[in-house]
Amino acid sequence: YAKINLANAIEELDLLEKKVESVIKTECDNARAYLENRIKNFFHEELINKLYRKIDPHPDFKSVRFKANFDSDHPRLDVFVENIKNENVLIPNLYFSTAQINILSLSIFLASALNSKEYDCIFIDDPIQSMDSVNVLSTIDLFRSIVVNEGKQIILSTHDENFHNLLMKKMPPNLFDSKFLELEAFGKLRAN
């Protein structure tokens, strides 16, 4: 009689274990889907891609994607770039140049700033580090577009005099509500 009770108890435990495993799997799948959706909304993936394409840092990889990775005990967020046909997927920090990584970072930052309803002013320190001249021009055009079309104010600081001069040419104070300041000496500014 004890063997039968033990066998029944084991069978009942097996059934309960399968039910619990099924519930846990369903809850994990729901949590994963929820987190993936929250990540997509938090990072404003569509806007990041729109901004990223405007600067155009890479000839093939035009799309950015964020993916939560739950495959290990320590979940993490992975960032990928994809080509137009979504055939090749890369982890940018392994294959991109410093300039391309900076452009990706700038796109992520600007998307977050543009989605802010509380702030109309964006502060950026030296946004063109390591960029070539084409990307610098595209970045200035993007800034100009943000100021004109999105109604945001952008305050830039840079040590690059060429970038400063290029900004003054592409966003002159007489056509835009722009102002350019230079640090003349310690604590002393000069307006252009």
Which residues does each predicted region cover?
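Flexible loop/turn segments at secondary-structure boundaries
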Residues: 73, 113, 130-132, 162-165
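GG-anchored amphipathic helix commonly corresponding to the ABC/SMC/Rad50 NBD signature/C-loop
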Residues: 83, 98-121
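C-terminal lobe/lid and adjacent interdomain/linker elements of RecA-like ASCE P-loop ATPase modules
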Residues: 136-192
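Extended, charged coiled-coil "arm/hinge" scaffolds of SMC/Rad50-like chromosome-maintenance ATPases
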Residues: 1-85, 119-123, 138
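Short pre-catalytic strand/loop immediately N-terminal to key active-site residues, enriched for Gly-Thr
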Residues: 89-94
